[in-house]
């Protein structure tokens, strides 16, 4: 069964809005912001794959693989930074990390 492109794009839009809401609502928690960004990137990946399926091109799948590689690198680096900052400040509150020494 082939899913219509409109349904795929509606689902991608809903996922993107949910990810954006997650980023905007939990601005103080770095881990929740990271989860929201990942949801938004997955929505973009779904839109690419749906469009590629509609037009019969492999470009969407290639972009999806690139997004998967980029997000895995992003998550590993971001979580390493969060663990480091949590060890130093004992919190994951983003407002605590914006203070500069000076």
UniProtKB/Swiss-Prot annotation:
Assembly notes: NDH-1 is composed of 14 different subunits. Subunits NuoA, H, J, K, L, M, N constitute the membrane sector of the complex.
Keyword Metal-binding among UniProt keywords: no
| Taxonomic path | Bacteria, Pseudomonadati, Thermodesulfobacteriota, Desulfuromonadia, Geobacterales
GO CC annotation terms, alphabetical: NADH dehydrogenase complex; plasma membrane
Q: What is its main location?
A: membrane
**What is the role of this chain?**
NDH-1 shuttles electrons from NADH, via FMN and iron-sulfur (Fe-S) centers, to quinones in the respiratory chain. The immediate electron acceptor for the enzyme in this species is believed to be ubiquinone. Couples the redox reaction to proton translocation (for every two electrons transferred, four hydrogen ions are translocated across the cytoplasmic membrane), and thus conserves the redox energy in a proton gradient.
EC number(s) given by UniProt:
7.1.1.-
Q: Which family does it belong to?
A: Belongs to the complex I subunit 4L family.
Name the Gene Ontology biological process terms: ATP synthesis coupled electron transport
Signal peptide residues are: none
**Gene for this chain:** nuoK1
- State the superkingdom: Bacteria
Name recorded for this polypeptide = NADH-quinone oxidoreductase subunit K 1
Give the reactions, separated by semicolons, that this protein catalyses: a quinone + NADH + 5 H(+)(in) = a quinol + NAD(+) + 4 H(+)(out)
Q: Name one GO molecular function term.
A: NADH:ubiquinone reductase (non-electrogenic) activity
Subcellular localization is given as:
Cell inner membrane
């Amino acid at each position: 069964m082939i899913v219509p492109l409109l349904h795929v794009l509606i689902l991608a839009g809903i996922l993107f809005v949910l990810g954006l809401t997650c980023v905007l609502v939990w601005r103080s928690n770095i881990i929740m912001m990271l989860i929201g960004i990942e949801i938004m990137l997955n929505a973009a990946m779904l839109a690419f794959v749906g469009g590629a399926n509609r037009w019969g091109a492999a470009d969407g799948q290639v972009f999806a693989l690139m997004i998967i590689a980029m997000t895995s690198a992003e998550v590993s680096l971001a979580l390493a930074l969060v663990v480091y900052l949590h060890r130093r400040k004992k919190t994951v509150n983003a407002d605590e990390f914006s203070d500069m020494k000076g």
